[in-house]
Amino acid sequence: MLVGLALSSCAPSHLPPGEGLHKSAVSHLREAEKTTLPDEQRAVRYLDAARESSALLGSAESGEASRVIYNKAAADLVVLLRSAQNGGMWNRPLTLSQGGSTYRLRFAKGTRDGLWNADQFTSFVPADEVDLKTIKRRNRIDGYGGALVSIRKTDPLEAFSPLVGVTAPVTAVLDFKGNDVTLSLIDPTERTKGRAAGKDRTLDADFSAPLAYYPQHNEMLEGLLGAIRVQQHMNITGLYMLQPYDPQRIPLIFVHGLISTPRMWRNVINEIETDPELRRRYQCWVFAYPTGNPLLYSALRLREELAKVQQRYPDSKDMVLVGHSMGGILSRAQVTTVERDSWDVIGEEKADQFFSKVKPGDLVHRCTNFTANPNVDRAIFICSPHRGSDMAIGTLGSLAIKLISLPVDLVSTAANTVGGSMSMITGDAKRMPTSIDGLSPKNPTVKVLDSCPIEVPHHSIIGDQGKGDTPESSDGVVDY
């Protein structure tokens, strides 16, 4: 019964009963939770609880209950020290005394092999306090140490940081040698073991909580508004890293499709993080953009963001792009070279007319002429309409085009450049092409991209509605 209670949760209200060998440790932990006490007194009580429980780790009689106490004490101590006294108790040697207890606490220095520098993060949240309702399968390992979501949020925000900051899984381990104690913040994606009570032990880790920490909204509504109210959502455009940059890992960049948001990828990323080899080799990024914009304009913005990554992090090589639906077309535009002559596939006379007013370097030129990114090593396309979708020219597509409101400055720039030649793309000399136009099988963009080779190894995941793995199959939107 005791083991069952210990396993149930590490939340404050689910501690093991205060009895038996660990009675004193539970008492220390409950006292440490009293926020009315001075910070130093609370820290000492967390250390008391961790020290007493660590002495029983692995014992047959009380080992599991002691593990729960030790883990919670380690996690909550980190949260306290990082937030107390405006960071005054963080990442410096501390001598802490209360009653008959005295501890000399030091922070382990960060290394490049799985030990975080304490100053890397601005706050912490215990992993068990994060709401995981949007995660289909929790990815965690039961072991030793306090599992935490670490957050790095600066003001102003650093490049490629989400609004809530960059998160990462961290496991806090306290190793006692008499009254001397070392606090280590371990990256469980790099290390599977940490030293506690004089022994290397399997780390407790939660890889799902850092993903679930990011705010969850109504995805369908947010995606729809991003498609039809483009101007109001232009500021979200960008690449975002979901963990601190690691030059040893390959950027795996996810690009969502029409009427969607980067949140669509959370369970895909969670499954990737489940595999020890994948999480060791890859770091996941997402590209966000309002999906109503012209397809080639969104592709340009992705291209510009990738260039910023390369400028800030020159070690970002061998990147892998994963695009769903229209996001696959944006991804393809990063691994394909399109030059002026490429547009002759729609007819030389039409192409000449369209480019007659286009000047090198202007917006339209940058959207329609580009080279494959040499730092992208592979592309994965998921249900991507490389040759367009008939749905874009049907009733639903026509209605969607009418609902989309594009940014005024973007419309003005394009109109002033190509003028009446816009009809070549939209059929209307006065109408700017939307993303829906870009998905039409009749659209010149689709024809041009389809005529240019993909310059990296690539893979396609193709949907099927039961017609078999044949050229006649379809997922209902995109034909084989």
Model-derived features with residue positions:
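Alpha-helix-centered segments that form part of catalytic cores
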Residues: 231-232, 242-247, 367-378, 431-443
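Flexible, membrane-associating and regulatory peripheral segments of lipid-active enzymes
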Residues: 10-252, 261-267, 283-286
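C-terminal subdomain of alpha/beta-hydrolase-fold enzymes, centered on the catalytic histidine
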Residues: 405, 411-480
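A Trp-anchored, charged/polar loop motif used as the substrate-binding/catalytic surface
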Residues: 234-239, 262, 305-312, 357-368, ...
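Serine-dependent carboxylesterase/thioesterase catalytic core
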Residues: 27, 31-37, 41-44, 53-68, ...
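Surface-exposed acidic, glycine-flexible loop patches that form ligand/cofactor-binding
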Residues: 242-245, 274-278, 310-315, 367-373, ...
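Short amphipathic alpha-helix adjacent to the substrate-entry channel of hydrolases
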Residues: 266-282
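Bacterial N-terminal signal peptides
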Residues: 1-8
